[in-house]
UniProtKB/Swiss-Prot annotation:
Keywords: mRNA processing, mRNA splicing, Nucleus, Phosphoprotein, Repeat, RNA-binding. The gene is rsp-7. The lineage of its organism: Eukaryota, Metazoa, Ecdysozoa, Nematoda, Chromadorea. CDD domains: RRM_SRSF11_SREK1. One of its GO terms (cellular component) is nucleoplasm. It comes from Caenorhabditis elegans. InterPro entries: Nucleotide-bd_a/b_plait_sf (IPR012677), RBD_domain_sf (IPR035979), RRM_dom (IPR000504). Residues 273-290, 323-335, 345-360, 370-382 have a biased composition (Basic residues). This is Probable splicing factor, arginine/serine-rich 7. Residues 259-272, 291-305, 383-421 have a biased composition (Basic and acidic residues). One of its GO terms (biological process) is mRNA splicing, via spliceosome. GO terms for molecular function: RNA binding. Residues 10-91, 163-240 form the RRM domain.
Length: 452
């Protein structure tokens, strides 16, 4: 086994456990964090006495990261006590006898620095006492040593400060969750982170980050100048501890538990009174009557408180419903406006398209009519010479016909005139006697055939 594996803390010390909690309770509570190799609960069942007030437990996990996560369960109420979860630096769970003989306590424990990290008091030049923390790992890695603290600083605060680093040169307005995720991912398990924007004149923000393990401080210091949102981070030792929210005390946790138990007991009493038959009821004694009156007063007080709580809860629910209703109405109105605007835009767009189409159709009709008119004009121009020629031909033909008819009439007249003249001559001449046919010249050389 290497030295690095030896330094890994895999054992969790759980203190301030209620005596009513069993081993199964503790196992089921921490088993979901990771695989448990071993679990010891002290004092054991055979060693619990009437003077035993609390229990303590040691849990060995298979993975050291489970120890880091389990520390966030500190102040979780189990039965009637708020538990405290701390890493146990030794590699082996102590047995019960050696644990109690060495002064081990079952009450709320206190976190300790790793064994190789030591504190010592040293006087400064001006005579004041300072607390110096020596970590050999920082020296080996060439990292700056822990800054000195006042000698009267509480040991618990010293341990917290030595697990905390200062982070500077953060962008203004940066989200704290982003810083938390960054350090969790690259440097180590973070227990707390506190953001500070600083004065307006300061060009950057800063933060304090507290790790679950002191060894994570070395990882963070080695990454001084880490690039985050195009800015080099300034990572240094912190001189102060993070101011944390007030933890719930045992008295507060116990008061809440007693209130819950009393409410449950009152409910059981009411159920028992309803189920009790009239025959089993007895006349109460004066003492019982006083106790009954006290219980009635307690019940009335509890009922009033419960009614008040329910009333406040109903008021909150009504307010929440009103807000949701207003939000829904606003969303509906917004959607309605959006739909109307969208419909108007669509209608305008359709109208524009219709008008555009109508204009296009009109243009096309106009162009078509213009083309038709031009075509007709061309046709009329091309047909007019033919018409003129036809008309002239008809006139010429008519004239020829008229000329022919007039000429025919003239010829007929001439012919008739010739005939009349030939008939007159025929009568004056004697008839031939020889029976021969003679040719006679008649006007203009026409030949006429005559028979006997």
């Amino acid at each position: 086994m290497s030295g690095e594996e030896k330094e890994k803390v895999k054992i969790l010390h759980v203190a301030n456990i209620s005596t009513s909690a069993t081993r199964d309770h503790i196992y089921n509570m921490f088993n979901y964090l990771g695989k448990i190799q071993d679990l010891k609960v002290y004092p054991s069942e055979g060693n619990i006495t009437a003077n035993t007030l609390l229990k303590t437990a040691f849990i060995k996990f298979d993975d050291e990261r489970c120890v880091e996560v389990a520390q966030h369960l500190t102040n979780t109420v189990v039965i009637d006590c708020a538990i405290v979860c701390l890493p146990y630096p030794n590699p082996v769970i102590p047995d019960e006898e050696s644990f109690f003989n060495s002064g081990g306590s079952t009450t709320a424990g206190q976190r300790q620095l790793p064994p190789h990290v030591t504190n010592k008091i040293q006087e400064s030049d001006d005579g004041s006492a300072l607390l110096i923390t020596v970590d050999p790992t920082l020296e080996q890695l060439g990292l700056p040593a822990y800054p000195p603290l006042p000698a009267d600083t509480d040991s618990a605060k010293v341990e917290e400060i030595r697990r905390t680093v200062y982070v500077g040169n953060l962008p203004k307005g940066v989200d704290g969750n982003e810083v938390l995720e960054l350090f969790n991912m690259y440097f180590g398990e973070v227990m707390y982170a506190r953001m500070a924007s600083g004065p307006d004149a300061l060009p950057c923000a800063y933060a304090y980050v507290e790790f679950s393990q002191q060894a994570s401080v070395c990882n963070a210091l080695q990454n001084d100048g880490f690039e985050f949102k195009e800015r080099p981070l300034k990572i240094q030792h912190s001189r102060v501890a993070i101011i944390k929210p007030q933890a719930k005390t045992d008295e507060q946790a116990l008061g809440e538990i007693e209130e819950a138990i009393r409410m449950g007991r009152n409910g059981d009493d009411r159920d028992r009174r309803r189920s009790r038959s009239p025959r089993r009821r007895r006349s109460p004694s004066p003492r019982r009557r006083r106790d009954s009156r006290d219980r009635d007063r307690d019940r009335d007080r509890d009922r009033r408180r419960s009614r008040d709580r329910r009333s406040r809860s109903r008021d909150r629910d009504r307010d929440r419903d009103r807000k949701r209703s207003r939000s829904r109405d606003r969303k509906r109105r917004s959607r309605s406006r959006d739909n109307k605007d969208r419909d108007r835009k669509r209608s305008r767009s359709r109208d524009r398209r219709r008008r555009s189409k109508s204009r296009d159709r009109k243009r096309e009709r106009s162009r078509s009519r213009s083309k038709d008119r031009k075509r007709d004009k061309k046709r009329s121009r091309s047909r007019s010479p033919e018409k003129r020629r036809d008309k002239e031909d008809r006139k010429t033909e008519k004239k020829e016909n008229e000329n022919e008819s007039s000429l025919r009439e003239k010829l007929l007249e001439k012919k008739a005139a010739r005939k009349d003249s030939s008939d007159d001559e025929w009568e004056e001449k004697p008839t031939p006697t020889n029976g021969e046919v003679k040719n006679e010249e008649i006007g203009n050389g026409d030949v006429v055939m005559a028979s006997e």
